[in-house]
């Protein structure tokens, strides 16, 4: 993932200043729209009681920092999903390349019409293996570049995934997910764990994982969670789920089905809380309804 450098002429500089001004005005307009809509959460909800009636806002109870919030709107999201498969390709990962390929390919067999996959492999640097596609044959060919090398810089890879792959799709695309295929170990990222978790939550990106056993055996990690806890916090913190790598086929079907059939958008105006503070989010539903969302709203501080 590279950043391009552009030489700017004097006339080009004037044009850039004009564009920046127009863009700033546009951002003010977008912000106004967002304020009018309130805060938006992506929510996963499904019935377990065999009832057929739709899930409504009256079935839900939302809290921020323990204070109940009034739900403005709750609606099913039928839009296609954009799923990034983030695959650990580091040297000491306790599995082989063929298993990583097989697990990745399972998603190509399960996505729905309109869904797209993006494959990134990482060691010290994230590497684009396959850009957005729904073509299983194209994806299978691209996976030949998987290898095992170096150390896992998971947090940096997540940061690049959000900033360079997912953010350019927003705000038009709300249904975004990352599937981490690895054990959660990070050895050397410059991006702090808390920072990337906050960014995932702030952008409503849901993290799932096909988890591989921790290669360190649960060893203490200075200034960051243990590998297993990294996976737990990424998934629970964003409203995702964990599956063992050995159940890749089941996991891919579950994740793709869930994103297409059970995703909702919930909007509300936060009351008695400050957007400049981190706010714990807690949502419960009537009996017979399973529901998940992210665990927190990060502070609104740039």
Where are the regions that the model predicts?
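C-terminal "exit" segments of structured domains
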Residues: 32-39, 223, 233, 245-302
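Exposed acidic/Ser/Thr-rich ligand/metal-binding surfaces
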Residues: 105, 113, 123-218, 222-223, ...
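Bacterial N-terminal signal peptides
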Residues: 9-20
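Soluble periplasmic/extracytoplasmic beta-strand elements of cell-envelope proteins
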Residues: 39-46, 59-63, 72-73, 82-86, ...
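Positively charged n-region of N-terminal signal peptides that target proteins for export
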Residues: 1-8
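Extended acidic, low-complexity intrinsically disordered regions
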Residues: 25-29, 147, 157-159, 203, ...
């Amino acid at each position: 993932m590279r950043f391009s450098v552009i030489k700017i002429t004097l006339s080009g500089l004037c044009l850039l200043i004009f564009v920046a001004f127009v863009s700033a005005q546009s951002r003010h307009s977008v912000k106004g729209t967002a304020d009018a809509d309130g805060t938006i959460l992506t929510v996963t909800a499904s019935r377990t009681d065999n009832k057929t009636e739709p899930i409504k806002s009256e079935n839900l109870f939302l809290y921020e920092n323990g204070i109940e919030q009034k739900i403005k709107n709750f609606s099913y999201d039928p839009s296609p999903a954009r799923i990034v498969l983030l695959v650990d390709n580091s040297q000491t990962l306790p599995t082989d390349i063929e298993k990583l390929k097989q697990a990745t390919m399972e998603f190509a067999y399960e996505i729905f019409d309109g869904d797209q996959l993006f494959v990134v492999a990482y060691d010290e640097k994230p590497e684009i293996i396959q850009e957005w596609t729904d073509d299983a044959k194209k994806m299978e060919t691209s996976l030949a570049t998987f290898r095992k090398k170096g150390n896992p810089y998971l947090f940096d890879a997540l940061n690049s995934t959000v900033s360079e792959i997912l953010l350019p799709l927003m705000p038009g695309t709300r249904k975004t997910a990352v599937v981490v295929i690895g054990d959660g170990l990070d050895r050397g990222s410059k991006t702090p764990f808390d920072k990337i978790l906050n960014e995932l939550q702030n952008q409503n990106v849901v993290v799932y994982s096909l988890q591989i056993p921790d290669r360190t055996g649960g060893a203490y990690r200075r200034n960051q969670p243990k590998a297993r806890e990294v996976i737990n916090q990424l998934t629970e913190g964003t409203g995702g789920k964990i599956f063992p790598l050995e159940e890749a086929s089941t996991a891919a079907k579950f994740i793709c089905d869930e994103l297409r059939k059970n995703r909702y958008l919930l909007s509300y105006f936060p009351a008695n809380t400050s957007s400049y503070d981190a706010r714990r989010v807690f949502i419960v539903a009537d009996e017979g309804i399973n529901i998940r969302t992210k665990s927190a709203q990060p502070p609104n501080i740039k």
